[in-house]
Amino acid sequence: MDLWTAAQALILGIVEGLTEFLPISSTGHQIIVADLIDFGGERAMAFNIIIQLGAILAVVWEFRRKILDVVVGLPKQQEAQRFTLNLLIAFMPAVVLGVIFADTIHHYLFNAITVATALVVGGVIMLWAERRVHTVRTETVDDMTWRDALKIGLVQCLAMIPGTSRSGSTIIGGLLFGLSRKAATEFSFFLAMPTMVGAAVYSGYKYRDMFRPDDFAVFAIGFITSFVFAMIAVRALLKFIATHSYAVFAWYRIAFGLLILATWQFGWIDWASAKA
């Protein structure tokens, strides 16, 4: 492993960790940054799976007490049973649509221009959602009904379009469906666990031939970096949403998306995978 390859792994690990749980699209940022630093091919497919696992481990660690309480209480406690059922209900739409459409979406939509467009559109929707008057009827994740979970699960499917943001769609969807800001954010984190692990297992099996012993050091750098920066991002976001709205992320999405579109339109950057 040369120094530049290590630097690429470090950069992409940081990007994944910082963006995975913020409503700004980690997949979109990965596509853009990987394009800029010329990190692609079979190694990149396997590498992306590894750094996503690093990010999800950070959330598992951050919410380990809640997870342990649910696991211990699952046989007898109705609250734990309802929470688990809600996660399964919210998880299933992504499983069904992911298996059916994942390859098609990856082939046609994984490019810089799709990402930029989705960033802008998603940012506008976030601003609209934030400016609406919210009637909170669900204060905590334990108060959610199966209908709340199903609606959030359906909204999560929008994130199959790169640049949309899984966390952004589930959080904003939760707010529109009557969840408190804290409940919407926490449920988005919990839903990420089965969703991302399921996607990683599916992709890992599908691309199992791309995992090579020679790439272990690269994977290790990306995994550790992603874990550390995801932990920082999750803790920062939980503190941030206690006193702020998501408008700042919306404006960031719009500005970043427009910048990408401008560089493409004026030919300042030759995006390797750009499509009109």
Curated annotation (Swiss-Prot):
One Pfam family in the UniProt entry: BacA
GO biological process: cell wall organization; peptidoglycan biosynthetic process; regulation of cell shape; response to antibiotic
The protein's Enzyme Commission number: 3.6.1.27
Catalytic reaction(s) noted: di-trans,octa-cis-undecaprenyl diphosphate + H2O = di-trans,octa-cis-undecaprenyl phosphate + phosphate + H(+)
GO molecular function: undecaprenyl-diphosphatase activity
Function summary: Catalyzes the dephosphorylation of undecaprenyl diphosphate (UPP). Confers resistance to bacitracin.
Record flagged with keyword Cell inner membrane: yes
Source organism, top-level taxon: Bacteria
Name of the protein: Undecaprenyl-diphosphatase
Gene of this entry: uppP
Chief place of localization: membrane
InterPro entries: UppP
Further details from the record: Bacitracin is thought to be involved in the inhibition of peptidoglycan synthesis by sequestering undecaprenyl diphosphate, thereby reducing the pool of lipid carrier available.
Record bears the keyword Disulfide bond: no
Compartmental location: Cell inner membrane
UniProt similarity note: Belongs to the UppP family.
GO cellular component: plasma membrane
Transmembrane regions: 43-63, 85-105, 109-129, 183-203, 218-238, 254-274
Topology relative to the membrane: Multi-pass membrane protein
Sorted UniProt keywords: Antibiotic resistance, Cell inner membrane, Cell membrane, Cell shape, Cell wall biogenesis/degradation, Hydrolase, Membrane, Peptidoglycan synthesis, Transmembrane, Transmembrane helix
First-level EC class: hydrolase
